[in-house]
Design a protein with these regions (language model features):
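Glycine-centered flexibility motif
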Residues: 2, 12, 27, 34, ...
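Local beta-strand/beta-hairpin segments that build beta-sheet-rich folds
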Residues: 37, 57-60, 101-103
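Glycine-rich, low-complexity segments
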Residues: 2-47
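Short, surface-exposed loop/turn motifs at beta-strand boundaries within globular domains
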Residues: 3, 35, 56-58, 67-71, ...
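Short intrinsically disordered coil segments
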Residues: 24-26, 57, 164-165
Length: 185
């Protein structure tokens, strides 16, 4: 038999050790859809570059998270500071357990990415690549999210730096991040 409890205010007993706490019996859960249940963040504080025609994991931008319910979602957000050789394109994506979360449709033989950029060369970094995806993994198992990037063949991709990386005040070092939030479903 289902019941409905309608109240305008819930208050703990004044004689309780903590009268502002509502206790829930063991094994039961209060549902609050849309609330953030856990947050994790990884930062890549250094810089490096690579040249490879296939997707590569970005150093330190890997996180694992275990959802508490199959109805919960994972908000994955990446801010990646990247640059490439002049007029060379690069792509960035987030993968869950090795697979791209969302894949663009009708791409033909093009390479799938969540965001892409075109290198400005020398000391001209591109704007940060920002990805924000709401994933619905339907899982309570540990999930591993990674940021990956790749550049056109024979070109170099620079993470948190630029092609010209001399040690002077006119150059900037950046930080790239991956943030995961479990959202109650």
């Amino acid at each position: 038999m289902a019941s409905t409890l309608s109240v305008s205010k819930i208050q703990g007993l004044a004689t309780a050790a903590n009268p502002t706490t509502v206790e829930v019996s063991s094994g039961h859960v209060l549902q609050a859809p849309g609330h953030i249940l856990q947050v994790k963040q990884a930062q890549f504080l250094g810089n490096y570059n690579f040249n490879d025609a296939s997707y590569q994991d970005i150093t330190d931008l890997t996180l694992s998270i275990t959802p508490s319910s199959t109805s919960n979602k994972i908000l994955a957000k990446c801010i990646l500071c990247a640059s490439a050789n002049a007029n060379q394109r690069f792509g960035v994506r987030i993968v869950r357990d090795g697979s791209m979360i969302f894949t663009p449709t009708s791409i033909g033989s093009r390479t799938a990415a969540h965001v892409f950029g075109d290198g400005a060369g020398s000391n001209k970094p591109t704007m940060p690549s920002v990805i924000e995806l709401l994933d619905a993994p339907s899982s309570t198992s540990s999930l591993t999210y990674k940021v990956q990037a790749h550049c056109e063949a024979s070109s170099t991709l620079y993470i948190n730096s630029t092609e010209t990386w001399s040690d002077d005040y006119t150059k900037f070092g950046a930080v790239s991040t991956l943030t995961l939030m479990e959202i109650a479903g």
